Protein backbone atom coordinates (compact mmCIF):
# COMPACT_ATOMS: atom_id res chain seq x y z
CA UNK A 1 0.00 0.00 0.00
CA UNK A 2 2.68 2.46 1.06
CA UNK A 3 4.45 2.57 -2.30
CA UNK A 4 1.41 3.48 -4.37
CA UNK A 5 1.76 6.36 -6.80
CA UNK A 6 -0.08 9.56 -5.90
CA UNK A 7 -3.24 10.36 -7.79
CA UNK A 8 -2.42 13.62 -9.56
CA UNK A 9 -6.09 14.27 -10.21
CA UNK A 10 -6.57 15.93 -6.82
CA UNK A 11 -5.87 19.66 -6.50
CA UNK A 12 -2.36 20.40 -5.29
CA UNK A 13 -1.57 22.65 -2.31
CA UNK A 14 1.78 23.68 -0.78
CA UNK A 15 2.04 23.89 3.00
CA UNK A 16 4.70 23.82 5.69
CA UNK A 17 5.25 23.71 9.43
CA UNK A 18 6.44 26.86 11.25
CA UNK A 19 6.95 27.67 14.94
CA UNK A 20 9.45 27.77 17.79
CA UNK A 21 12.35 25.34 18.09
CA UNK A 22 11.43 22.07 19.90
CA UNK A 23 7.69 22.73 19.84
CA UNK A 24 7.27 19.63 17.67
CA UNK A 25 7.25 20.74 14.00
CA UNK A 26 9.19 17.73 12.71
CA UNK A 27 7.33 15.27 14.94
CA UNK A 28 4.04 16.66 13.63
CA UNK A 29 5.29 16.41 10.04
CA UNK A 30 6.14 12.74 10.63
CA UNK A 31 2.79 12.14 12.35
CA UNK A 32 0.81 13.67 9.46
CA UNK A 33 2.68 11.55 6.90
CA UNK A 34 2.25 8.40 9.00
CA UNK A 35 -1.45 8.79 9.78
CA UNK A 36 -2.51 10.00 6.31
CA UNK A 37 -0.46 7.43 4.39
CA UNK A 38 -2.28 4.68 6.29
CA UNK A 39 -5.63 6.25 5.34
CA UNK A 40 -5.10 7.50 1.78
CA UNK A 41 -1.91 5.85 0.50
CA UNK A 42 1.48 7.46 0.02
CA UNK A 43 4.65 7.09 2.02
CA UNK A 44 5.04 7.19 5.78
CA UNK A 45 8.16 9.07 6.84
CA UNK A 46 10.11 8.56 10.03
CA UNK A 47 11.21 11.45 12.22
CA UNK A 48 14.89 10.83 11.39
CA UNK A 49 14.25 10.89 7.65
CA UNK A 50 12.61 14.29 7.93
CA UNK A 51 15.07 15.70 10.46
CA UNK A 52 18.06 14.88 8.21
CA UNK A 53 16.86 17.51 5.74
CA UNK A 54 19.00 17.67 2.59
CA UNK A 55 20.78 20.88 1.58
CA UNK A 56 19.50 22.77 -1.40
CA UNK A 57 20.38 26.06 -3.03
CA UNK A 58 17.93 28.85 -3.77
CA UNK A 59 19.30 32.09 -5.28
CA UNK A 60 22.79 31.08 -4.17
CA UNK A 61 21.68 30.55 -0.58
CA UNK A 62 22.10 27.17 1.08
CA UNK A 63 18.95 25.99 2.84
CA UNK A 64 18.16 22.74 4.60
CA UNK A 65 14.61 21.66 3.86
CA UNK A 66 12.71 18.40 4.07
CA UNK A 67 9.99 17.89 1.47
CA UNK A 68 7.29 15.32 2.08
CA UNK A 69 3.97 14.71 0.40
CA UNK A 70 0.67 13.32 1.56
CA UNK A 71 -2.95 13.08 0.58
CA UNK A 72 -6.21 13.90 2.26
CA UNK A 73 -9.68 12.94 1.05
CA UNK A 74 -9.77 15.96 -1.27
CA UNK A 75 -6.23 17.06 -2.00
CA UNK A 76 -2.59 16.32 -2.58
CA UNK A 77 -0.18 18.26 -0.35
CA UNK A 78 3.50 19.08 -0.63
CA UNK A 79 4.81 19.92 2.83
CA UNK A 80 8.11 21.54 3.85
CA UNK A 81 9.79 21.29 7.22
CA UNK A 82 13.09 22.96 8.15
CA UNK A 83 15.49 21.79 10.84
CA UNK A 84 16.74 25.20 12.00
CA UNK A 85 15.35 28.68 12.56
CA UNK A 86 17.81 30.20 10.05
CA UNK A 87 16.54 27.76 7.41
CA UNK A 88 12.98 29.01 7.95
CA UNK A 89 14.04 32.62 7.57
CA UNK A 90 15.90 31.88 4.32
CA UNK A 91 13.16 29.62 3.00
CA UNK A 92 10.38 32.11 3.54
CA UNK A 93 12.30 35.10 2.21
CA UNK A 94 13.70 33.44 -0.92
CA UNK A 95 10.38 31.76 -1.64
CA UNK A 96 12.29 28.51 -2.15
CA UNK A 97 9.20 26.81 -0.78
CA UNK A 98 6.19 28.98 -1.53
CA UNK A 99 3.43 28.20 0.96
CA UNK A 100 -0.29 28.44 0.24
CA UNK A 101 -0.77 28.03 3.98
CA UNK A 102 1.28 27.30 7.08
CA UNK A 103 0.75 25.02 10.07
CA UNK A 104 1.92 26.93 13.14
CA UNK A 105 3.05 24.43 15.76
CA UNK A 106 2.90 25.77 19.30
CA UNK A 107 3.59 23.75 22.45
CA UNK A 108 0.67 23.90 24.87
CA UNK A 109 3.16 23.39 27.70
CA UNK A 110 5.23 26.47 26.80
CA UNK A 111 2.87 28.80 24.96
CA UNK A 112 4.04 31.26 22.28
CA UNK A 113 7.83 31.83 22.28
CA UNK A 114 10.11 34.31 20.41
CA UNK A 115 10.28 32.26 17.19
CA UNK A 116 6.51 31.69 17.28
CA UNK A 117 6.18 35.46 17.00
CA UNK A 118 8.98 35.79 14.47
CA UNK A 119 7.56 33.11 12.17
CA UNK A 120 4.10 34.72 12.26
CA UNK A 121 5.68 38.08 11.40
CA UNK A 122 7.69 36.48 8.58
CA UNK A 123 4.56 34.78 7.26
CA UNK A 124 2.85 38.18 7.19
CA UNK A 125 5.84 39.90 5.54
CA UNK A 126 6.37 37.32 2.81
CA UNK A 127 2.68 36.86 2.07
CA UNK A 128 1.78 33.42 3.43
CA UNK A 129 -1.99 33.83 3.13
CA UNK A 130 -3.33 31.36 5.72
CA UNK A 131 -2.21 29.96 9.06
CA UNK A 132 -3.69 26.97 10.90
CA UNK A 133 -2.56 26.29 14.47
CA UNK A 134 -1.65 22.90 15.91
CA UNK A 135 -1.48 23.19 19.70
CA UNK A 136 0.99 20.40 20.41
CA UNK A 137 1.95 18.46 23.56
CA UNK A 138 -1.59 18.76 24.96
CA UNK A 139 -0.98 15.43 26.71
CA UNK A 140 1.43 17.30 29.01
CA UNK A 141 -1.16 19.85 30.15
CA UNK A 142 -3.86 18.66 32.57
CA UNK A 143 -5.32 22.07 33.27
CA UNK A 144 -8.09 23.02 30.82
CA UNK A 145 -7.83 26.68 31.85
CA UNK A 146 -4.14 26.73 30.99
CA UNK A 147 -4.92 25.32 27.53
CA UNK A 148 -7.52 28.02 27.04
CA UNK A 149 -5.02 30.67 28.07
CA UNK A 150 -2.41 29.45 25.57
CA UNK A 151 -5.06 29.37 22.84
CA UNK A 152 -6.02 32.97 23.63
CA UNK A 153 -2.39 34.05 23.55
CA UNK A 154 -1.86 32.46 20.14
CA UNK A 155 -5.03 34.07 18.75
CA UNK A 156 -3.93 37.49 20.04
CA UNK A 157 -0.50 37.06 18.48
CA UNK A 158 -2.03 36.15 15.10
CA UNK A 159 -4.36 39.15 15.23
CA UNK A 160 -1.44 41.43 16.10
CA UNK A 161 0.16 40.53 12.77
CA UNK A 162 -3.07 40.96 10.77
CA UNK A 163 -4.10 37.32 10.59
CA UNK A 164 -7.73 36.62 11.59
CA UNK A 165 -6.87 35.31 15.07
CA UNK A 166 -10.47 34.84 16.18
CA UNK A 167 -11.38 32.69 13.15
CA UNK A 168 -8.16 30.67 12.85
CA UNK A 169 -8.67 26.92 13.30
CA UNK A 170 -6.76 25.68 16.36
CA UNK A 171 -6.36 21.91 16.65
CA UNK A 172 -5.35 20.46 20.01
CA UNK A 173 -3.31 17.29 19.99
CA UNK A 174 -0.07 15.47 20.58
CA UNK A 175 2.13 14.74 17.57
CA UNK A 176 4.13 12.27 19.65
CA UNK A 177 1.03 10.25 20.59
CA UNK A 178 -0.18 10.26 16.98
CA UNK A 179 3.22 9.10 15.75
CA UNK A 180 3.20 6.28 18.32
CA UNK A 181 -0.12 5.05 16.92
CA UNK A 182 -2.48 6.44 19.59
CA UNK A 183 -6.03 6.40 18.17
CA UNK A 184 -7.47 8.85 20.72
CA UNK A 185 -8.59 12.49 20.64
CA UNK A 186 -5.06 13.86 20.98
CA UNK A 187 -3.53 11.26 18.65
CA UNK A 188 -4.87 10.11 15.30
CA UNK A 189 -8.14 12.04 15.75
CA UNK A 190 -6.21 15.32 16.10
CA UNK A 191 -4.24 14.60 12.90
CA UNK A 192 -7.49 13.90 11.01
CA UNK A 193 -8.92 17.15 12.42
CA UNK A 194 -5.83 18.96 11.15
CA UNK A 195 -6.21 17.35 7.71
CA UNK A 196 -9.82 18.49 7.66
CA UNK A 197 -8.80 22.05 8.62
CA UNK A 198 -6.20 22.10 5.82
CA UNK A 199 -8.86 20.98 3.31
CA UNK A 200 -11.49 23.48 4.40
CA UNK A 201 -9.60 26.55 5.63
CA UNK A 202 -6.94 26.92 2.90
CA UNK A 203 -8.62 27.67 -0.44
CA UNK A 204 -7.36 25.89 -3.55
CA UNK A 205 -4.68 28.21 -4.98
CA UNK A 206 -5.16 29.80 -8.39
CA UNK A 207 -3.15 27.99 -11.04
CA UNK A 208 -0.51 30.08 -12.81
CA UNK A 209 -2.31 29.75 -16.13
CA UNK A 210 -5.47 31.30 -14.63
CA UNK A 211 -3.72 34.51 -13.54
CA UNK A 212 -3.45 37.81 -15.42
CA UNK A 213 -0.89 37.53 -18.25
CA UNK A 214 2.67 38.44 -17.24
CA UNK A 215 5.98 37.80 -18.99
CA UNK A 216 9.36 39.20 -17.89
CA UNK A 217 11.33 40.50 -20.88
CA UNK A 218 14.54 38.54 -21.39
CA UNK A 219 15.57 39.65 -24.87
CA UNK A 220 14.43 41.91 -27.71
CA UNK A 221 15.04 41.41 -31.43
CA UNK A 222 14.17 43.32 -34.55
CA UNK A 223 13.05 41.20 -37.49
CA UNK A 224 12.95 43.13 -40.75
CA UNK A 225 9.52 43.19 -42.29
CA UNK A 226 7.91 41.66 -39.19
CA UNK A 227 8.68 44.07 -36.38
CA UNK A 228 9.91 43.61 -32.83
CA UNK A 229 10.04 40.25 -31.09
CA UNK A 230 10.29 40.00 -27.30
CA UNK A 231 11.36 36.69 -25.76
CA UNK A 232 10.87 35.30 -22.27
CA UNK A 233 9.07 32.72 -20.19
CA UNK A 234 5.39 33.37 -19.51
CA UNK A 235 5.09 33.61 -15.72
CA UNK A 236 1.31 33.47 -15.53
CA UNK A 237 -1.83 33.70 -17.62
CA UNK A 238 -2.30 33.28 -21.37
CA UNK A 239 -1.45 35.58 -24.29
CA UNK A 240 -3.45 35.26 -27.51
CA UNK A 241 -2.66 36.75 -30.91
CA UNK A 242 -4.53 40.05 -31.33
CA UNK A 243 -4.64 40.93 -27.63
CA UNK A 244 -3.57 44.30 -26.24
CA UNK A 245 -0.68 44.24 -23.77
CA UNK A 246 1.22 46.78 -21.71
CA UNK A 247 4.98 47.15 -21.45
CA UNK A 248 5.62 47.99 -17.78
CA UNK A 249 8.70 49.09 -15.84
CA UNK A 250 11.89 51.19 -16.28
CA UNK A 251 10.14 53.70 -18.61
CA UNK A 252 6.62 55.07 -18.88
CA UNK A 253 4.05 52.30 -19.39
CA UNK A 254 3.28 51.77 -23.09
CA UNK A 255 0.45 49.92 -24.85
CA UNK A 256 1.00 47.57 -27.76
CA UNK A 257 -0.65 44.61 -29.50
CA UNK A 258 0.52 41.01 -29.78
CA UNK A 259 0.54 40.09 -33.47
CA UNK A 260 2.18 36.70 -33.13
CA UNK A 261 3.41 34.06 -30.70
CA UNK A 262 6.33 31.80 -31.59
CA UNK A 263 7.67 28.77 -29.77
CA UNK A 264 10.59 26.69 -31.08
CA UNK A 265 10.29 28.60 -34.39
CA UNK A 266 6.66 27.55 -34.81
CA UNK A 267 3.79 30.02 -34.92
CA UNK A 268 1.12 29.52 -32.26
CA UNK A 269 -2.17 31.27 -31.60
CA UNK A 270 -1.36 31.57 -27.90
CA UNK A 271 1.31 31.20 -25.24
CA UNK A 272 0.64 30.23 -21.63
CA UNK A 273 2.26 30.06 -18.18
CA UNK A 274 5.48 28.04 -18.36
CA UNK A 275 6.04 28.50 -22.12
CA UNK A 276 9.27 30.01 -23.44
CA UNK A 277 8.00 32.18 -26.26
CA UNK A 278 8.76 35.01 -28.64
CA UNK A 279 6.00 37.60 -28.82
CA UNK A 280 5.70 39.81 -31.88
CA UNK A 281 4.62 43.36 -31.06
CA UNK A 282 2.84 45.69 -33.48
CA UNK A 283 4.22 49.21 -33.90
CA UNK A 284 6.78 48.82 -31.15
CA UNK A 285 10.37 49.80 -31.87
CA UNK A 286 13.34 47.68 -30.80
CA UNK A 287 14.53 50.50 -28.51
CA UNK A 288 11.12 50.83 -26.79
CA UNK A 289 11.53 47.53 -24.95
CA UNK A 290 14.36 46.34 -22.71
CA UNK A 291 15.30 43.53 -20.37
CA UNK A 292 13.83 44.15 -16.91
CA UNK A 293 10.46 45.27 -18.18
CA UNK A 294 7.43 42.99 -18.29
CA UNK A 295 4.69 42.41 -20.83
CA UNK A 296 1.38 42.26 -18.98
CA UNK A 297 -2.39 42.31 -19.31
CA UNK A 298 -3.39 46.02 -19.34
CA UNK A 299 -4.01 47.39 -15.85
CA UNK A 300 -2.90 44.20 -14.07
CA UNK A 301 0.45 45.42 -12.72
CA UNK A 302 1.97 48.85 -12.06
CA UNK A 303 5.53 50.21 -11.81
CA UNK A 304 6.91 51.30 -8.41
CA UNK A 305 10.15 52.60 -6.89
CA UNK A 306 9.39 52.86 -3.17
CA UNK A 307 8.55 49.84 -1.00
CA UNK A 308 9.25 47.99 2.24
CA UNK A 309 10.83 44.56 2.15
CA UNK A 310 11.93 41.71 4.35
CA UNK A 311 15.50 40.71 3.48
CA UNK A 312 18.02 38.06 4.43
CA UNK A 313 21.68 39.07 4.20
CA UNK A 314 24.04 36.28 3.19
CA UNK A 315 26.68 35.28 5.71
CA UNK A 316 30.37 35.36 4.84
CA UNK A 317 30.33 31.55 4.54
CA UNK A 318 27.56 31.76 1.96
CA UNK A 319 29.71 34.04 -0.18
CA UNK A 320 28.09 37.21 1.12
CA UNK A 321 29.61 40.36 2.57
CA UNK A 322 32.34 40.16 5.18
CA UNK A 323 31.29 43.44 6.80
CA UNK A 324 27.99 44.96 7.96
CA UNK A 325 26.12 47.60 5.95
CA UNK A 326 24.59 50.81 7.25
CA UNK A 327 21.73 53.19 6.49
CA UNK A 328 21.65 54.49 2.88
CA UNK A 329 23.58 51.46 1.59
CA UNK A 330 23.20 51.44 -2.22
CA UNK A 331 23.38 47.98 -3.80
CA UNK A 332 21.63 46.68 -6.93
CA UNK A 333 18.26 45.00 -6.66
CA UNK A 334 17.82 42.15 -9.12
CA UNK A 335 14.13 41.83 -10.10
CA UNK A 336 13.22 39.00 -12.51
CA UNK A 337 15.76 39.71 -15.26
CA UNK A 338 17.68 42.88 -14.39
CA UNK A 339 19.50 44.95 -11.77
CA UNK A 340 18.23 48.34 -10.58
CA UNK A 341 20.20 50.48 -8.13
CA UNK A 342 18.40 51.52 -4.96
CA UNK A 343 19.07 52.88 -1.50
CA UNK A 344 18.20 51.11 1.75
CA UNK A 345 16.69 52.75 4.81
CA UNK A 346 17.07 50.72 8.00
CA UNK A 347 14.56 50.64 10.88
CA UNK A 348 15.12 53.42 13.45
CA UNK A 349 16.46 51.00 16.07
CA UNK A 350 18.96 49.34 13.73
CA UNK A 351 22.32 50.99 13.28
CA UNK A 352 23.70 48.31 10.98
CA UNK A 353 22.94 44.92 9.47
CA UNK A 354 25.38 42.05 9.90
CA UNK A 355 25.95 39.26 7.37
CA UNK A 356 23.56 36.41 8.32
CA UNK A 357 20.86 38.78 9.66
CA UNK A 358 17.30 39.23 8.47
CA UNK A 359 15.74 42.69 8.67
CA UNK A 360 12.81 44.83 7.48
CA UNK A 361 13.97 47.66 5.23
CA UNK A 362 12.58 50.45 3.06
CA UNK A 363 13.93 50.70 -0.49
CA UNK A 364 13.96 53.51 -3.06
CA UNK A 365 14.90 52.45 -6.59
CA UNK A 366 16.30 54.83 -9.22
CA UNK A 367 13.97 53.34 -11.88
CA UNK A 368 10.47 51.86 -11.51
CA UNK A 369 9.89 48.10 -11.67
CA UNK A 370 6.60 46.28 -12.33
CA UNK A 371 5.88 45.18 -8.81
CA UNK A 372 3.40 43.41 -6.54
CA UNK A 373 3.56 42.54 -2.88
CA UNK A 374 5.24 39.15 -2.54
CA UNK A 375 7.66 39.70 -5.46
CA UNK A 376 11.10 38.17 -4.76
CA UNK A 377 14.42 39.85 -5.55
CA UNK A 378 18.14 39.41 -4.98
CA UNK A 379 20.46 42.08 -3.57
CA UNK A 380 23.71 42.26 -5.50
CA UNK A 381 27.01 44.11 -5.50
CA UNK A 382 28.69 44.12 -8.87
CA UNK A 383 26.97 40.92 -9.96
CA UNK A 384 27.61 39.04 -6.71
CA UNK A 385 24.56 38.08 -4.65
CA UNK A 386 24.77 39.44 -1.10
CA UNK A 387 21.15 39.05 -0.04
CA UNK A 388 17.61 37.96 -0.87
CA UNK A 389 14.37 39.76 -0.26
CA UNK A 390 10.65 39.94 -0.80
CA UNK A 391 8.43 43.00 -1.31
CA UNK A 392 6.27 43.40 1.81
CA UNK A 393 4.38 46.66 1.12
CA UNK A 394 4.38 49.04 -1.82
CA UNK A 395 4.62 52.69 -0.76
CA UNK A 396 4.50 54.38 -4.18
UniProtKB/Swiss-Prot annotation:
Query: Where along the chain is GTP bound?
Result: 19-26, 81-85, 136-139
Q: Looking at the record, which segments are called G1?
A: 19-26
Provide any one GO MF term from the record: translation elongation factor activity
Q: Which reaction does it catalyse?
A: GTP + H2O = GDP + phosphate + H(+)
The family database entries (InterPro entries) matched by this protein are listed as:
EF-Tu_GTP-bd (IPR041709), EF-Tu_GTPase (IPR050055), EFTu-like_2 (IPR004161), EFTU_2 (IPR033720), G_TR_CS (IPR031157), P-loop_NTPase (IPR027417), Small_GTP-bd (IPR005225), T_Tr_GTP-bd_dom (IPR000795)
Matching entries from Pfam families are given as: GTP_EFTU, GTP_EFTU_D2, GTP_EFTU_D3
Q: Which UniProt keywords apply?
A: Cytoplasm, Elongation factor, GTP-binding, Hydrolase, Magnesium, Metal-binding, Nucleotide-binding, Protein biosynthesis
Tagged with keyword ATP-binding? no
Region of interest called G5, as start-end residue ranges on this chain? 174-176
One GO CC term on file: cytoplasm
> What positions does the entry give for Mg(2+) binding?
26
Give every tr-type G domain span.
Answer: 10-206
Q: Does GTP-binding appear among the keywords?
A: yes
- Give the span(s) annotated as G3: 81-84
Identify the main location: cytoplasm
Note down the stretches annotated as region G4.
Answer: 136-139
E.C. no: 3.6.5.3
Q: What are the subcellular locations of this protein?
A: Cytoplasm
Q: Where is this region: G2?
A: 60-64
**What is the role of this chain?**
GTP hydrolase that promotes the GTP-dependent binding of aminoacyl-tRNA to the A-site of ribosomes during protein biosynthesis.
Family assignment from sequence similarity: Belongs to the TRAFAC class translation factor GTPase superfamily. Classic translation factor GTPase family. EF-Tu/EF-1A subfamily.
PANTHER family documented for this protein: ELONGATION FACTOR TU, MITOCHONDRIAL, ELONGATION FACTOR TU-RELATED
Quaternary structure and interacting proteins, as annotated = Monomer.
Protein name from the UniProt record: Elongation factor Tu
This protein's species is Burkholderia mallei (strain ATCC 23344)
Amino acid sequence: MAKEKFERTKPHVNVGTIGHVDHGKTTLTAAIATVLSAKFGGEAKKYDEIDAAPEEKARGITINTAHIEYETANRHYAHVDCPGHADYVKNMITGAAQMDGAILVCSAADGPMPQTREHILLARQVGVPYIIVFLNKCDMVDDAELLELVEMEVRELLSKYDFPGDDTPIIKGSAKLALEGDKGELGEVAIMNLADALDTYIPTPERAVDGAFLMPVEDVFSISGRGTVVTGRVERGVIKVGEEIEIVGIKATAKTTCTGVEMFRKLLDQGQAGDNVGILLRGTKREDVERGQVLAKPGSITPHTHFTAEVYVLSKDEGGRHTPFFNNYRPQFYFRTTDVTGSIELPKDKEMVMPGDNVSITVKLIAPIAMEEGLRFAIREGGRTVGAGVVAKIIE
